[in-house]
Amino acid sequence: MELEEQERDILFPTDDEECQVDVSCDDEDDDSSSYSSLSQNDSAPWPRSYRQSVDILTGVTPPTISFIHRRSSQTSFTSSVASLYKRRPTSIANSFASSTSKQPLLSEKDDVLFLSSQIGLSNTDLSYGEPNFCSFPQSVLNGINVLCGISLLTMPYAVKEGGWLGLCILLSFAIITCYTGILLKRCLESSSDLRTYPDIGQAAFGFTGRLIISILLYMELYVCCVEYIIMMSDNLSRVFPNITLNIVGVSLDSPQIFAISATLIVLPTVWLKDLSLLSYLSAGGVFVSILLALCLFWVGSVDGVGFHTGGKSLDLANLPVAIGIFGFGFSGHAVLPSIYSSMKEPSKFPLVLLISFGFCVFFYIVVAICGYSMFGEAIQSQFTLNMPQQYTASKIAVWTAVVVPMTKYALALTPIVLGLEELMLPSEKMRSYGVSIFIKTILVLSTLVVALTFPFFAIMGALMGSFLAMLVDFIFPCLCYLSILKGRLSKTQIGICVFIIISGIVSGCCGTYSAIGRLVGKLD
């Protein structure tokens, strides 16, 4: 098979096109108009802002001062944005075209210019410094921070639903998702133009693949925002359980009051232009996970709640819900390409995945065993809701579960906001801070409506894990890998991918059906 067919019509640049990303400040003024016109090319694929916004969400690259000619009030955020585009040198004119779509992928400088237009920076404010990559320990911390999130709280509940043997499924999911993360790496290595998960989708299936994957990733972030509201509401209701309010004949109970209160608290953080502080705070997610696990163990061992034997070995009727929750626990593939792209030594990415997934599955299993052993069949959707409030460790855990979503909500919503602005307001003249505030406010209020309608943390997590995580973390990595590297794979590699795809389809269908059934039953 010819090279062109194997690489899905990759367009190689001519000598005249070979212009490196690292451009000096003197040359930039002369070229800014051409770069600006390229970045605003109508044929550029949506979403163009995905990589930048997700990198801001995860903080995968340590920030450096790479923007100049700007007052210090803007330095922190702009420097963070500039640091997102430090990767191996590539040609500014390189473009990728699949057999089904000839729309080019954006270069790194196009990405920077596009995002600078979103946050109100001019071309003359930009300068491109030396590459600033993540070290191996930083990459490991980023990986753990992405994977080990709010799903940690619901692992004991998943064991209650599926039984002790459900932990075998948790372990198998960790192995599978770690492997599919490596498949994404191999897809990225097939072309220097591929940077993000949507890029991989376009390489495999044209613009349709890019669009489907982008929508799924944005849906994941949206559901996370809903989960944050529910999480804050549930834990605040645990602290203040007897609060009620009657407004114009409408009676609100404690969870509803605190869902509204939590929304009002996070709303100003969404309006912020500078998200750097929130990004730094959310980067401590790994330490939060350790703190929550320690608090749970402390309450069980020191405060006297104790650990008890017993429980179901296997509950086939409720196992699909547990499958969805376990899938929810490993839904981090949306940003794994960004972690890979930011590494000083990309060859160590498989080791980063191995350590990150190993850490997460270890903590998931420990928390699941401790929580279910302590509270048994009485375990609730979040183990913090079962912890006796008279103990200091319980109070620390509950308030940690309240504060953490406040730092993460705006970061999770930002990629959705930028994607919608890009889609709904294609012209820069139509964009303004006021319009952005309006879109953000509507999105925040919509998450409140969903949280009030479906205030079931574990079931929403199970639905997300069954439907979205199975597609994003199981099925699409294998499909993209088979498509991009078609003709160069062994029968064993193909067989493994087919097995994972079938497993994802079966798990996704069973889990989604069960989760929807639970939601309907709760609403009746």
Curated annotation (Swiss-Prot):
Q: Name one GO cellular component term.
A: organelle membrane
Residues spanning the membrane? 139-159, 164-184, 211-231, 247-267, 280-300, 319-339, 349-369, 398-418, 442-462, 465-485, 496-516
GO terms for biological process, alphabetical? amino acid transport
Q: Where is this region: Disordered?
A: 1-47
- Tell me the compartments it is located in: Membrane
Where does this protein have compositionally biased stretches of type Acidic residues? 14-32
What does the UniProt keyword field contain? Amino-acid transport, Membrane, Transmembrane, Transmembrane helix, Transport
Q: Please give, as recorded in its UniProt entry, the membrane topology of this protein.
A: Multi-pass membrane protein
Low complexity compositional bias, start-end? 33-43
Question: Pfam families, from UniProt?
Answer: Aa_trans
Specify whether Transmembrane is a keyword of the entry.
yes
- Which protein family is named in the record? Belongs to the amino acid/polyamine transporter 2 family. Amino acid/auxin permease (AAAP) (TC 2.A.18.5) subfamily.
Name under which the protein is recorded: Amino acid transporter AVT1G
Give the organism's phylogenetic lineage. Answer: Eukaryota, Viridiplantae, Streptophyta, Embryophyta, Tracheophyta
